[in-house]
Amino acid sequence: MIEADRLIAPAAITEEEQLDRAIRPKMLSDYRGQDQVRSQMEIFIEAARRRSEALDHVLIFGPPGLGKTTLANIVANEMGVNIKTTSGPVLEKAGDLAALLTNLEPHDVLFIDEIHRLSPVVEEVLYPAMEDYQLDIMIGEGPAARSIKLELPPFTLIGATTRAGSLTSPLRDRFGIVQRLEFYKVEDLAHIVGRSADVLGLSLDQQGAFEIAKRARGTPRIANRLLRRVRDFAEIRSDGHISDQIAAQALDMLDVDNAGFDYMDRKLLLAIIDKFLGGPVGVDNLAAAIGEEKETIEDVLEPYLIQQGFLQRTPRGRIATPRAYLHFGLTTPERQG
């Protein structure tokens, strides 16, 4: 799949995960960006601590790479409790979930990533666990089967998803706290890049941090990945110090431009501009023109371009915006103006 090969893919790459854990902030005081989320969570956590209660169940949603897992771990650290981590696809049977729930200590956190991918049978078991701290388990099979209730300690479920709209209403309604993570501002990303450089022992100046941040598509995971690649460049082509000039040279070499676009982003936009006169163009024709699958365009390439105002989806098809023309140094056609 194209997403796995892109330097600017927001999804986690397996070999990155251990390093990412090392540079993640551990407490809210180290957590930069998402100001409203941070302020609200500070209040909710402090209130729960003062009452000696488990924090309400938390749903965190937003695009990949914005720190949902990081925030879940911070919540557990701030509450002074353990966290058990799993994901929706892993919980295939009700017994898988029951094994996790029955091993929780009071006020512990159970973090379920990709919670929108829970199977219906597992989700049914989760409802009474979230609402009443009870677990209904079927023992035996056939006519001899019977249900038993197990009492659970008060716990906090934190669910993370990139697709909040895919959650069922009964599940969504059981979360007392719902937080949406937004793309990060360049200033906040630059701070994150600087902190990561400190943790990794890198020499990085403020201008270098900003150069990396502005090409990171508003996503901390991408920013940290770009930092590691720029570090390689600085060590081999320079004295190891990362300045804005070194960062720009490295990222240009890696084909990540000053808007955070790679070859595929540019290919998509230029196809609309050059082959379809700026659009509108249907996604099937666009897929044929650039040699990609329709699903790749819709799920991988388009979201960031639309969010940043370079592309519009209309009932008649895709349109390149004036901002897209400006990015390529082209004149916007009159009908677009």
Curated annotation (Swiss-Prot):
GO terms for molecular function: ATP binding; ATP hydrolysis activity; four-way junction DNA binding; four-way junction helicase activity. It is found in: Cytoplasm. DNA binds at residues 313, 318. This is Holliday junction branch migration complex subunit RuvB. The RuvA-RuvB-RuvC complex processes Holliday junction (HJ) DNA during genetic recombination and DNA repair, while the RuvA-RuvB complex plays an important role in the rescue of blocked DNA replication forks via replication fork reversal (RFR). RuvA specifically binds to HJ cruciform DNA, conferring on it an open structure. The RuvB hexamer acts as an ATP-dependent pump, pulling dsDNA into and through the RuvAB complex. RuvB forms 2 homohexamers on either side of HJ DNA bound by 1 or 2 RuvA tetramers; 4 subunits per hexamer contact DNA at a time. It comes from Tolumonas auensis (strain DSM 9187 / NBRC 110442 / TA 4). Belongs to the RuvB family. The lineage of its organism: Bacteria, Pseudomonadati, Pseudomonadota, Gammaproteobacteria, Aeromonadales. Coiled coil: none annotated. ATP binds at residues 23-24, 65, 68-70, 131-133, 174, 184, 221. GO terms for cellular component: cytoplasm; Holliday junction resolvase complex. Keywords: ATP-binding, Cytoplasm, DNA damage, DNA recombination, DNA repair, DNA-binding, Hydrolase, Nucleotide-binding.
